[in-house]
């Protein structure tokens, strides 16, 4: 519940550190000035916001929803995955993020290095190559 969450943020004086933004057409300015991106989706296809965060070398903590995050984060090698809907697991990941600087840096590096597989030109060439096999 958004109201309860906003109340919790106010009561605990977290307004300077926690922002609940909701959907943004262009998330780039928000991600650029953040240290970590948390995706709490129950369902995703290809969560572009994760790719955008990784492009900006931001750390990602994501729900392990049915498709998308696990693949992008390479089963957790490129970020942290928490059990979908488990805010206890999410809070553990956030605490781990704050304490494990070397681990976080290595996961950011891994995620950024893995972006090549999402390169548009490379994928278009692959599609073209596979489609022309049928001619």
Where are these regions (language model features)?
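Short hydrophobic beta-strand element within catalytic cores of glycosyltransferases
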Residues: 59-63
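Nucleotide-activated donor-binding/catalytic signature segment of Leloir-type glycosyltransferases, i.e.
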Residues: 5-22
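Short acidic/histidine- and often glycine-rich active-site loop of Leloir-type glycosyltransferases
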Residues: 52, 65-76, 80-81
């Amino acid at each position: 519940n958004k109201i309860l969450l906003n109340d919790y943020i106010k009561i605990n004086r977290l307004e300077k550190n926690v922002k609940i933004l909701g959907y943004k057409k262009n998330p780039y300015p928000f991600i650029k000035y953040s240290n970590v991106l948390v995706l709490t989706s129950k369902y995703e296809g290809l969560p572009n916001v994760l790719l955008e965060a990784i492009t900006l070398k931001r750390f990602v903590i994501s729900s392990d929803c049915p498709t998308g995050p696990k693949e992008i984060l390479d089963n957790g090698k490129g970020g942290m995955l928490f059990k979908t809907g488990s805010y206890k697991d999410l809070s553990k990941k956030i605490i781990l993020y704050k304490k494990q600087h070397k681990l976080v840096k290595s996961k950011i590096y891994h995620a950024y290095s893995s972006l090549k597989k999402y390169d548009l030109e490379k994928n278009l060439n692959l599609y073209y190559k596979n489609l022309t096999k049928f001619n």
